[in-house]
Amino acid sequence: MAFYLETTPSNLPVLDPSEEILLVQDQVGLYFGDEKSFRHNNGTLYLTKKHIFYVDSVDPKKNSLKIKISDIRDVQHTSRYFRSSPKIRLSLRHVEKSWACKICTFINVGDPINPCRNCGVANRFTIIKPKSDARFSQGLCTACTFQNYPDLNTCEICGNQLKNVDRNQLIQLSFRGSGSSKFYEAIKSETDEIEKQRYSNKYDTKVLRKAILEKSLRMGGIHDLEQSHEMQLAKNGRTLVHAFQDLDAFFSLAKDTMSLADQFAEKMDGLTGTQQSDKVQQLLNKSNQLGVLRGNHLDNVPVSANSRLYDIELCKSISEVLRTRLKADTDTVTMTQAWAIYNRSRKANLIPPTRFVKACELIDSMEVGITTSKMNSGLILFQLKTSNHSGKLLSAILEVMNPSTTALKCAMRLHWSIGVTLERLYQAEMDGYIVRDVYEESGSSLLYWKNEFDELSEELTKWFDES
């Protein structure tokens, strides 16, 4: 069944520590049974090894869902037919919320494929039940009382439905755009892997029993114990030798990779004009196929010159990285700093500045927890999206003044760069909240003071009126 999905402020699914996004596809709607869900009419699908995440485009906080891949019993794909979009039909098995361990009778919560949380024994034992007529009673028609074969869905005599299919156990993924075949192959691969794991957990008792028997036959007496200890030491020595050999091979491979990257960069610099764009795209496609470049889930998103899906996912990824850097309400980074921080977190397959700026233009239109502001000089700043953000920045600047401050002291106290500090002080000065004065002793430094001239002028005006 489908469960409620918790999303991040950047409208990305909250992943488990061992999860990573394998595939992304937008313009997808959901069907529960054969009925179209109007609350889940358009969204983005994210596939991992454990879940299928649906993040709604209209209201991601309320309408986002997730499906466990271990709950999927069957996967079917239907292609486009006239005006009907291609769909992936997910038949879900009924998973009990709790199950009792047959060894220690501990009540576990979750999928029965997981081992018991108390004794650690997998749920691979079945209790043999006596034969009865319960199987054949399942095919009894309630309309004409005809005894049908248990696996039939409809009565052979009157055509009455024998089995009630729960609409929550059949979910259809409707792909309004492309990508249904690729997504189906990925889901099918993950479900097959889950079935293999389920089969191995169920039938690995023979292998375990054989290993215990072989170990017990080898061990016997003090001489065998000493021999076993010597064999273990020799095995550990061989393991260390192979490890250092692999480490040397890794370092040599790293040098070759760096030289290959230098040749790659020289070839890029040698191309010009339209030839550069075509050749660059070919080389990037080849390098991605060979696994030379490695990044986050953006590498699984189709990219093109006008790919809005890629820009949206890049915008979400940028906000995720910046939110780890912006802790307080007054923290601020520039566009250049944000670009450097994000590419440093990727480590490879870096984002060019033009693509980064194009994705950042979507930040204010998307609810990702980050907002931008443009200063008078054209400098673009990133900060956390909070209520009355400009008032909080002004209060922070005024608190630094005791009773005056310099740009350097203000930058150190608020953890801003000197450029951002000068922009903020200039903006506050233009708004009339602070004033500047040349520091006479040093001759070059500027002191910023709170603007108390307005209050003084009001008091003087009031005094003259009274007199």
Curated annotation (Swiss-Prot):
Q: Which UniProt keywords apply?
A: Cytoplasm, Golgi apparatus, Metal-binding, Protein transport, Repeat, Transport, Zinc, Zinc-finger
Cited PROSITE patterns: GLUE
Q: Name one GO molecular function term.
A: zinc ion binding
User: Major location, coarse class?
Assistant: cytoplasm
Q: Which GO terms describe its cellular component?
A: cytoplasm; ESCRT II complex; Golgi apparatus; late endosome membrane
Superkingdom of the organism of origin: Eukaryota
- The GLUE N-terminal domain covers 5-94
| Compartments in which it is found | Cytoplasm; Golgi apparatus
GO BP of this protein: late endosome to vacuole transport; protein transport to vacuole involved in ubiquitin-dependent protein catabolic process via the multivesicular body sorting pathway
Stretches assigned to the GLUE C-terminal domain: 170-203
Instruction: Indicate the family of this protein.
Output: Belongs to the VPS36 family.
How does it associate, per the subunit comment?
Component of the endosomal sorting required for transport complex II (ESCRT-II). Binds ubiquitin.
Q: What is this protein called?
A: Vacuolar protein-sorting-associated protein 36
The organism named in the record is Schizosaccharomyces pombe (strain 972 / ATCC 24843)
- In the UniProt record, what gene is named as encoding this protein? vps36
